[in-house]
Amino acid sequence: QIIATPIMVPNKLIPRRDENGEKYYVYFTEETIKKIAYAFAQSKNNDKINHEHDMDSMVDDVYVAESWIVDESNNDKSNVYGYSLDKGTWFGLFKVDNDEYWRDFIKTGKVKGVSVEGYFINKLTKLI
């Protein structure tokens, strides 16, 4: 049970909401995404997966099995999975060995994507 998906896409405005429900946008350059991906790996976060950014809702037996930064859009391993992504995109393969999570959240479409934990990104701002 594998999920193949972009983790972060560069040079796009991404809508978010703050704690008061106010809308704002975040934006990441290719270089920033590369720094985030490397820091994520260096911090050994590959198996620290939670549900909906809830640190009290860690998901066992789900991990990033593989990830990379797209270098050539038309000649990238992500093409095999049906993607044509911008240079600088962080792409990943998530292995889901948790049958219950796969059945209840992935297969039902309740979980539609991945997001790098905000806390992790906030810590990273000190590195950039």
Where are these regions (language model features)?
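Signature of dsDNA virion morphogenesis modules
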Residues: 1-128
